Design a protein with these regions (language model features):
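Extreme N-terminal starter segment of soluble prokaryotic enzymes
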Residues: 1-5
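Glycine-rich FAD pyrophosphate-binding loop
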Residues: 6, 10, 19-42
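N-terminal Rossmann-fold NAD(P) dinucleotide-binding loop
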Residues: 14-15
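Rossmann-fold NAD(P)-dependent oxidoreductase module
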Residues: 20, 103, 107
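Glycine-rich phosphate/pyrophosphate-binding beta-alpha loops
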Residues: 41-44, 91-94, 196
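Short, conserved loop/turn and helix-capping segments at secondary-structure boundaries
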Residues: 44-48, 163
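A conserved beta-strand/loop capping segment in the N-terminal third of enzymes
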Residues: 47-103
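Predominantly flavin-linked oxidoreductase catalytic cores and closely associated redox partners
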Residues: 107-222
Length: 222
């Protein structure tokens, strides 16, 4: 297989790049280790500016997620102490990544873009422009885009000595089991070193999580 561009990672950034490439009449293949639709640790806040950018990519049918709601403000907390509300510049769409990424991926495929799901990469040869998959299939490319995150295989092409020490945890909680009735986003600072926590409501559930620098002395499960 030969492509003008191969993209590693089919999240929003990789898929957006793929749409741009297809729109410019170039061949594109996106490789992802997961099968779509799939869940993703993410609060799911998409700004008005981002939605306008996505519309400019000519995605076809407009995204209408069943669990999406619109938020216009975020509440800021220092640990459990309320500090203030901040009004957003435009709407923030609180999306379910299970739905949102599936929409972006299938719109890309409808344009003729190639997607390899459930596919792992064994090696990337940047001298000969060849990607070797674990099934020993080779893919040739002119250009490669790394959109597979901080611990992805393309990161190692830049600096093999980087040792990521950040981590993230998230759980989706049914709204019916809570008294959280607001459409406001909530951000919590001071809950752990070098990080923050969040509660982002969706139509039927709350996305609750935190991200920070890992410290083995802290019992995060408590």
């Amino acid at each position: 297989m030969n492509y003008d561009v191969v993209i590693i990672g089919a999240g929003p950034s990789g898929i957006a790049a793929g749409h741009n490439i297809i729109n410019n009449k170039l061949s594109c293949c996106i490789i992802d280790k997961q099968v779509f639709p799939r869940n993703k640790i993410c609060a799911g806040g998409v700004t008005q500016k981002t939605f306008e950018l996505l519309k400019s990519l000519n995605l076809g049918q407009e995204f209408k997620g069943e669990n999406t709601i619109v938020s216009k403000s975020v509440s800021i907390y220092l640990k459990d102490k309320y500090i203030t509300d901040i009004e957003c510049k435009g709407n923030t769409y609180l999306v379910d990544r299970f739905e949102f990424d599936e929409y972006l991926v299938r719109a890309y495929e409808k344009k003729g873009g190639k997607l390899l799901e459930n596919t792992k990469i064994k090696n990337i040869d940047t001298e000969n422009n060849i990607i070797t998959l674990y099934d020993n299939q080779n893919i040739k490319f002119k250009y490669i885009i790394g959109a597979d995150g901080a611990v992805g295989i393309t990161r190692s092409l830049v600096d093999k000595d980087i040792k990521p020490n950040g981590f993230c945890l998230q759980v989706d909680v049914d709204k019916i089991n809570t008294n959280y009735n607001s459409d406001k986003m909530s951000m919590y600072y001071g809950v752990l070193p070098y990080g923050y926590g969040w509660i982002f409501p969706k139509k039927n559930h709350l996305s609750v999580g935190f991200i920070g620098e890992y410290d083995k002395k802290i019992d995060y499960k408590c």
